[in-house]
């Protein structure tokens, strides 16, 4: 039996993970990026950019449920949602499940990524691009939040790691723009990497966000594809109460929403804000 081809992730120099490649569906390598989508028997379709896994069919639901339902149910009455990035459509898919949301704006810098993901990752968007509440804006995320006249109740930054094109979505200019177009009491969330291996990224986000929001913290979820520990999500708002809502309040909102999830539930929501001591200590050591 012929040995299967392997794809190795290159995010870290000293260690990593690999996937067996059953079938390469797409591979484009240019001076600017290396994009590949392949099939793996354990994880389904896998998309990687510049040597780093971005999403897989098998476990994407964990990431996307936690990035949408945590802020939306904590807010309680969000009407207008902004997604920065998210061209694969899975974040949009989860937001559309909230029937009280009236408008969903997605800002994607690459016009081709939506059609590309429609073709190669159809299970991610599950038809959500056709939702009448959805509007796609082709623009740089930093430019959009600093120029738009729209305001939002929840902003979800579905950014890549802070290298290359994704670096601008971890800057003070971006965070300031997000604060500018958030409605009072609005919530901003963003992926912040695997904290055990990328702690400096979390601390940097904490410092910068604290200049613009009165309540800044993190919540976490275990996502197998993002190896090295627990995935960390930044949380920022000026409504200090929203991070500390009781499980009973979240439970009532969850039941009223009619959501049926595979990972998220009200107990997970509450528990996600319990941070490991090493991260608590690192955040506590930052100047106020």
Swiss-Prot record:
Coiled coil: none annotated. Spermidine binds at residues 64, 88, 158-161. Its EC number is 2.5.1.16. Residues 9-238 form the PABS domain. One of its GO terms (cellular component) is cytosol. GO terms for molecular function: spermidine synthase activity. It catalyses: S-adenosyl 3-(methylsulfanyl)propylamine + putrescine = S-methyl-5'-thioadenosine + spermidine + H(+). The active site is at residue 158. Keywords: Cytoplasm, Polyamine biosynthesis, Spermidine biosynthesis, Transferase. It is found in: Cytoplasm. PROSITE patterns: PABS_1, PABS_2. S-methyl-5'-thioadenosine binds at residues 33, 108, 140-141, 165. Pathway: Amine and polyamine biosynthesis; spermidine biosynthesis; spermidine from putrescine: step 1/1. GO terms for biological process: spermidine biosynthetic process. Catalyzes the irreversible transfer of a propylamine group from the amino donor S-adenosylmethioninamine (decarboxy-AdoMet) to putrescine (1,4-diaminobutane) to yield spermidine. Belongs to the spermidine/spermine synthase family. This is Polyamine aminopropyltransferase. It comes from Shigella sonnei (strain Ss046). The gene is speE.
